[in-house]
């Protein structure tokens, strides 16, 4: 019969065998026999089994040099570690709620009548991908350079992919934690999606919104005809970020809402100038001015009567015609500010 002191000496001697970098000695290639590498996901349970036979007098499971169980006696203070079986043929333990710090080598050590023998198994802990740091939503001016960051953790290390979610079909994919955009354009605004993938679980996906500011551009401003006594409506549509503010002028006079039978309504990209009862004096050239913090632009629009000769082109085709008038209007705007 073995004295307890002998067992202590045995375990201490066995522990010396597991110095990092030193191969584990094993007297018999088939005894004891532990499992191959065990792979589990973070949060799951891991079962470590060791096959033994009736030659075994003492058994123990160790994590590196720390004894977890010696026979039925628990040495570990970790309540997640429990013994499953201690029979003549198998000695196994279970680790509940496995975490990344549980990863590493585990050793089944046995004492026979002759000498200690060991067998090792490596526990691999897989961790689902998780994005741990990502850029906040950002607003920049057109032409600026932008860097978006998306840092992810997981085991195996996840692959990080950036994708532009564009409704115009101009989306692109970049496989890197950092996405760099040089000279950003208004078409590159919108949501950017970061995905972290490692095949352990579903990808972790998060989004960043990129807003690109740009000066106003008048996209629609058409001449309009109306008879005396009828309603006439001039429309001016401008694209801009931030949204443009509109002003209306006749020649060099700024029009005020509600005066002289006109109403000015501006909502989003569209501004309208409405004449409720058109008179002869209302006919003529009007200028729509769209302004935001990055700049301004203007378009000339004509309200004409029946039979009048007019240019029905859009705002772009009439830009040169309004140049002199715009110089006058700009001077007036500067005085107003």
UniProtKB/Swiss-Prot annotation:
Any one GO cellular component localisation term in the record: plasma membrane
Keyword list, A-Z: Cell adhesion, Cell membrane, Disulfide bond, Glycoprotein, GPI-anchor, Immunoglobulin domain, Lipoprotein, Membrane, Repeat, Signal
Coiled-coil boundaries: none
Lineage: superkingdom: Eukaryota
Ig-like C2-type domain segment(s): 32-119, 129-211, 215-302
Prosequence residues removed at maturation: 315-337
Protein's GO biological process: cell adhesion
Organ and tissue specificity: Restricted to the nervous system.
Disulfide-bond pairs as recorded: 50-108, 150-194, 236-288
Signal sequence segment: 1-20
Family annotation (SUPFAM superfamilies): Immunoglobulin
Entry's localization field: Cell membrane
Membrane topology: Lipid-anchor; GPI-anchor
Family matches, as Pfam families: I-set, Ig_3
Positions of glycan attachment: 133, 277, 285, 298
Lipidation (GPI-anchor amidated asparagine): 314
UniProt xrefs under PROSITE patterns: IG_LIKE
Function: Inhibits neurite outgrowth.
Family recorded in the similarity comment: Belongs to the immunoglobulin superfamily. IgLON family.
Protein name per its UniProtKB record: Opioid-binding protein/cell adhesion molecule homolog
Name of the coding gene: OPCML
């Amino acid at each position: 019969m073995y004295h307890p002191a002998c067992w202590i000496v045995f375990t201490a001697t066995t522990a010396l065998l597991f110095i990092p970098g030193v191969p584990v000695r094993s007297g018999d290639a088939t005894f004891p026999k532990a499992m191959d590498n065990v792979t589990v996901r973070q949060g799951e349970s891991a079962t470590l089994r060791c096959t033994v036979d009736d030659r075994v007098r003492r058994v123990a499971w160790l994590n590196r040099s720390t004894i977890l169980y010696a026979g039925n006696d628990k040495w570990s203070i970790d309540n997640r570690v429990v013994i499953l079986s201690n029979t003549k043929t198998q000695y196994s333990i279970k680790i509940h709620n496995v975490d990344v710090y549980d990863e590493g080598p585990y050793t089944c050590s046995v004492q026979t009548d002759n000498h200690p023998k060991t067998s090792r198994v490596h526990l691999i802990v897989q961790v689902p991908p998780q994005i741990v740091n990502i850029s906040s939503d950002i607003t920049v001016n057109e032409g600026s350079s932008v860097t978006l960051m998306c840092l992810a953790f997981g085991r195996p290390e996840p692959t990080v992919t950036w994708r532009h979610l564009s409704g115009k079909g101009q989306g692109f994919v970049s496989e890197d934690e950092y996405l760099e955009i040089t000279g950003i354009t208004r078409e590159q605004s919108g949501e950017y999606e970061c995905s972290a993938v490692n095949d352990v679980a579903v990808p972790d996906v998060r989004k960043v919104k990129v807003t690109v500011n740009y000066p106003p551009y008048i996209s629609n401003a058409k001449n309009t005809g109306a008879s005396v006594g009828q309603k006439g409506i001039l429309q001016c549509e401008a694209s801009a970020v931030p949204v443009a503010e509109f002003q209306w002028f006749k020649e060099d006079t700024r029009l005020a809402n509600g005066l002289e039978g006109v109403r000015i309504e501006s909502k989003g990209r569209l501004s309208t100038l409405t004449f409720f009862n058109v008179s002869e004096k209302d006919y003529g050239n009007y200028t729509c001015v769209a302004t935001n913090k990055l700049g301004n632009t203007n378009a000339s629009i004509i309200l004409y009567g029946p039979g009048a000769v007019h240019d029905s082109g859009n705002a772009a085709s009439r830009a040169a015609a309004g140049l002199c008038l715009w110089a006058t209007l700009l001077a007036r705007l500067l005085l107003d500010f």
